[in-house]
Amino acid sequence: MAKLPVDKMRELERRFGEIEARMSAGPAADVYVKLASEYSELQPVVKAIRELGLAEKEVADLKALLADKSTDREMRDLAEMELPDVEARLEGLEKEIQIQLLPKDAADEKSAILEIRAGTGGSEAALFAGDLFRMYERFAAGKGWKVEVLSSSEGDAGGFKEIIATVTGRGVFSKLKFESGVHRVQRVPDTETQGRIHTSAATVAVLPEAEEIDIEVRAEDIRIDTMRSSGAGGQHVNTTDSAVRITHLPTGLVVTSSEKSQHQNRAKAMQVLRSRLFDMERQRADSERSADRKSQVGSGDRSERIRTYNFPQGRVTDHRINLTLYKLDRMMMGEIDEVVDALIADYQAGQLAQLGEQA
């Protein structure tokens, strides 16, 4: 385990104390809001640092008691029993602090753009894409996040050929970023008379939602085309040109939004375009970091098969961390915390291991 950065820990405690004092002094409302945000960010790690100090003192006291030849047998026995528990607590606190002090992904606190596209498997792939969207929608609802569909293309038998949505809330990207990749499903279609299992797939992409300050999109770099929105069967929803297609000329990226309001469509399409460009910048930066290339969980390779959903066996397997759960029904209802948390823990363990190698 890497050595704890004592100087940094002391600085965090000092800053936390300073924030407490300034908040108690009754600053202006806007200043108070900023201080409160920093306070809530620092509180978990400072709490762990203070508990670490108490645990270190407790270990030192117990060892001193055991080293003292005048300690009676009863006290010695109690100290010998207590020491392993305190040392285990100390080790846990050290690991917790190291995780808290890991370099933060600047995008973690952002909302996200969720894109799901049917892959191989025709109608079954579209149905599965719909199942995945509902799974994430329920997961988001459980977190108090807001989901808004930006654009969608329905499959012939239901589900979606493609669906793009915003998931808005604090820390959305940190929870969903490891969902990017190919999701494979194995199940017996309703139309299958012989009971044969079919395999199909859908691709998920999760992008941090970019704001105007994150990425600049110059007016001369885009072409905006308006079209008539089409409903089921190609019928026009209205008589005005409302669908918007934005092409980013330098990269060739094309984004379309086809809701009823042209103004909303332009804003939504720009929102997705900014997020895709921001994601491209992040992917480029990540590929230049050898540490990220070593991390399979953190690679974000959207061509990689990351998870298999086997309906006949009620089994879900995440291939990146070799995690298998027989909770498919519950997961499809949005209960994906166990997989999400395991992926985050694996990524953090990889970061800690790299710090240990550098120490």
Swiss-Prot record:
Keywords: Cytoplasm, Methylation, Protein biosynthesis. One of its GO terms (cellular component) is cytoplasm. It comes from the Bacteria. Its main location: cytoplasm. Residues 282-307 have a biased composition (Basic and acidic residues). Residues 282-309 are annotated as: Disordered. Belongs to the prokaryotic/mitochondrial release factor family. Peptide chain release factor 1 directs the termination of translation in response to the peptide chain termination codons UAG and UAA. This is Peptide chain release factor 1. It comes from Allorhizobium ampelinum (strain ATCC BAA-846 / DSM 112012 / S4) (Agrobacterium vitis (strain S4)).
